């Protein structure tokens, strides 16, 4: 038995376990004030409002997904309008979207990712700039310029994130992967390369691994293969193989163990199917269910139990819709009606603050 008081130290031996009778206070601070990353280190994060521990690869949050659950939809278009709107829903409760704020400009064919606190949107089209905007998800308001751009300007890029790092991948005529550290602004750095140039793609994460959907490259047909990366370490993507077929325009979401590919088109025909893939095994995606309407390039987000797929395009250029589907991610089956977006919109993108790439136990 060892009694621990204020400023007490142990000069030899080790403590295999510690029972605290009254109070135990770990180090605390913001994300930027985390202690040295040693396996087993504990920390209370003021940004995420939860206990974290370092598992040897990354900081993991403990049981904080239930305190969040907001999904955002960024921009998009409906002939002839180009939208700057940011709308949101609370995933746990059904209903229509509400206005959150606005991007720095009207845009379509961008993509976005989020951690527990920030949502980030990249690429403005048709201005075709590599601009990055961000918002604080818990509080509404207009987007703020990130302070750095993608290293390449490419619409229809893929996007995915863990709790600390966000990834933009590919896009029109490029295979470049960029990353940002989400807790700090003004950074965007080369990460590596996809196995081939991909556009009209999306991505999802587990707490360690990112998967980028097949996509295509104009004017050629869609790719059959999919890539994956280890988000915590820079480097080129690794080819998985043909796991979903030749599909562009899918929207992705994930639990902590599986990723989902929703909708898309091949070739030029919109699809309603939802497929599920176990992220750790990187095996073929299996049929999970169907959207209520075949479409592509909508906005997706999820919490631990439910995903939403908002709006999308049934046929280009004048086939945008305003429906929102709800998907139970624990059981296979078709979607149910969730509500409606404020207007018909396609070539949009979505994020949530409680997806499977953020950990949580």
Roles of regions detected by a PLM:
Residues 1-361:
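Polar, enzyme-active/binding microenvironments
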């Amino acid at each position: 038995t060892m009694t621990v008081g204020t400023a007490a130290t142990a000069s030899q031996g080790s403590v295999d376990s510690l029972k605290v009778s009254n109070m135990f206070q770990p180090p605390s601070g913001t994300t930027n004030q985390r202690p040295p990353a040693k396996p087993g280190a504990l920390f209370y994060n003021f940004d995420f409002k939860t206990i974290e521990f370092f598992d040897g690869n990354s900081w993991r949050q403990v049981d904080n997904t239930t305190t969040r659950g907001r999904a955002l939809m960024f921009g998009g278009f409906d002939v002839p309008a180009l939208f700057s709107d940011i709308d949101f829903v609370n995933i746990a409760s059904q209903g229509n979207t509400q206005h959150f704020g606005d991007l720095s400009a009207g845009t379509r064919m961008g993509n976005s990712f989020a951690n527990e606190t920030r949502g980030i949107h990249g690429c403005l089209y048709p201005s075709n700039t590599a601009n990055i905007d961000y918002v604080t998800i818990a509080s509404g308001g207009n987007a703020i310029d990130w302070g750095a751009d993608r290293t390449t300007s490419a619409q229809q890029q893929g996007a995915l994130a863990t709790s600390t790092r966000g990834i933009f991948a590919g896009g029109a005529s490029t295979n470049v992967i960029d990353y940002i550290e989400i807790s700090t602004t003004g950074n965007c750095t080369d990460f590596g390369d996809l196995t081939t140039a991909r556009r009209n793609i999306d991505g999802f994460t587990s707490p360690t691994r990112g998967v980028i959907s097949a996509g295509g490259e104009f004017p050629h047909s869609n790719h059959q293969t999919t890539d994956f990366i280890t988000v915590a370490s820079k480097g080129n993507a690794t080819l998985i193989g043909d796991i979903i077929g030749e599909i562009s325009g899918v929207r992705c979401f994930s639990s902590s163990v599986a990723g989902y590919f929703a909708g898309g088109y091949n070739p030029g025909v919109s699809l309603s199917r939802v497929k599920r893939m176990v992220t750790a095994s990187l095996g073929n995606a299996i049929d999970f269910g169907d959207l209520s309407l075949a479409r592509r390039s909508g906005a997706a987000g999820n919490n631990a139990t439910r995903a939403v797929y908002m709006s999308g395009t049934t046929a280009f250029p004048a086939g945008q819709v305003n429906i929102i589907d709800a998907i139970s991610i624990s059981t296979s089956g078709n979607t149910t009606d969730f509500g409606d977006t404020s207007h018909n919109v396609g070539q949009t993108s979505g994020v949530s603050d409680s997806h499977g790439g953020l950990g949580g136990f």
